[in-house]
Amino acid sequence: MVKFFKVLFVLFGFLSISIAQKKVESPKLVVGIVIDQMCYEYLYRFESKFSKNGFKKLMNNGTHCRNTQYNYVPTFTGPGHASIYTGTTPDNHGIIGNEWFDRNAGETVNCVFDSTAYGIGTDSQNGKCSPHYLKANTITDQLRMTYPSSKVISMSIKDRGAILPGGHLSNGSYWFDNITGKFVTSSYFKKEMPFWVNTFNEKNYPNNYLNQTWNTLLLLEEYKESEPDNSPYEQLLQGKLTPTFPYDLKEMCKGQPNFNLFTSTPFANTYLTDFAVESIYNEMLGQDGQTDFLCISYSAPDIVGHAFGPYSIEMEDLYIRLDLEIARLIKELEKKVGKNQFTLFLTADHAVVPVPQYLLDKKLPGGYLFLESNLIQLDEEVKSEFGADLILSEENNNIYLDRETIDFLKIGRRDVELFIAKRIANWEGVKNVYTSEELINSTTDNSWKDMIRLGYVPNESGDVVFMLEPGYLPKTKDSEKSRKGTSHGSAFNYDTHVPLIWYGKGISKKEVFRRINITDITATLVHLLNVQKPNATTGEPILEVLEK
């Protein structure tokens, strides 16, 4: 027995030495790159068109987690960014969508809108933003709490893409105001705009880009990985009669700057990279003894992807150009922060479903659920059964009930939910329907229900939640326009399977094929930064990233 304990003691000693030797030295700077709407397959579908210093450099020299999945629904931008940076799912961090129906306000609210904040750099509503709906700490919050002198800078074209990654303690979160055509922030983060941001804004880059033409970077016939240019599945950009190259932005604007049009082009990615580089130099990121954190979210891929779909030449060209922006960013990081002095991760907030009409024409599973007619009929059925209008709203496949009226009339809420669930189950394209009771009290091992449950917050989500069959999208009504373009939000692989690559200091070259959940990113950063887990983190560290 004594010998046994001696052996254990020796083994424990070796283990302790091993762990001590593996203590990670934190990088000078962590760079989190989130690409808004990127399918995993783009890394390989467009690989032959990529340069050697962008995506390929990350893939060939970093740790590539090839089976990274979202483990909840809905797969939207707000929840995606929040889950990446909190390391937990919407049921904990509270961001259940880009918008949801607020029962108290009686209206739909944006996930980062804050009526108590005001814009810095703009007088428009676009400045009234903060992370006040975010109920959990981010890894960037944790870094600032542990090391108060560390800087966190976050930026995106979209407000939510900047605000949620930067968290509650960001030193600067900036997003693009499509009214003024400039980067702005809010009173939540700043009392006044930093001098360097004002200087950058004064250069009016978006106006200059709107005088240019978006044409393919390569010869049109080289885009063999995509559908023909003039595709029936693509939406029209304002000022254009066909969804085809070239896009003469000056002609399309017709004399008036259209900053929404600007964000629908690859130039918005270039503009964001310019801003990121300016922040590295002006905020002196990675230049002192404490680790800093730079959050960058490229929004243009999502805007272009919604309009044209994943098999469009527009999307392929955008990614070929984005590859060059990634290469430029890495070059600037190596120049200013130093090679092997920063750690970078690249992922996406969601992927995307192919245009359902494209799937139908290819004789593949897919289709549309047209909500308007179904909801009108459902309203009538509910009134007939219970004698009152009990449905307040539908948002993101959630049915919100008038709980006050139900309670006043002394109708069983469960009875109303079950009645509605049975009707919705008969709608074309509906796969599953769940009541709030089923989701709150769920103990079954049902992967679809579990994914919905992890995205469900009782006081924010609806009373009945439904999911569609693979390849289906919800639309308001049937029309030629509604069958063009695409979206995301489902529990299926085309929406949940995203890239995840780690690169830089402390990262070795390897491929990881086991399943990684998106919530594991923050759990891994905890050990790269040597900080406490953020308060609600449920993910697990990716050991392959941390091991040499």
Where would I find each of the regions flagged by the language model?
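Secreted, luminal/periplasmic, and some membrane-associated catalytic domains
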Residues: 50, 67, 76, 98-128, ...
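Beta-strand elements within well-structured catalytic alpha/beta cores of enzymes
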Residues: 27-39, 58, 84, 143, ...
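His/Asp/Glu-rich, glycine-adjacent segments
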Residues: 89, 97-290, 299-306, 428, ...
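Bacterial Sec-dependent N-terminal signal peptides
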Residues: 1-26
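Short, structured active-site-proximal loop/turn typified by the sulfatase FGly-forming signature C/S-X-P-X-R
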Residues: 43-92, 151-155
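Non-catalytic, well-ordered alpha-helical segments in soluble enzyme domains
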Residues: 56, 136-145, 396-433, 514-540, ...
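A long, amphipathic alpha-helix that forms part
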Residues: 42, 262-288, 301-342, 418-419, ...
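Substrate-binding rim/cap in mid-to-C-terminal beta-strand-loop elements of soluble/periplasmic
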Residues: 373-411, 485-529, 546-548
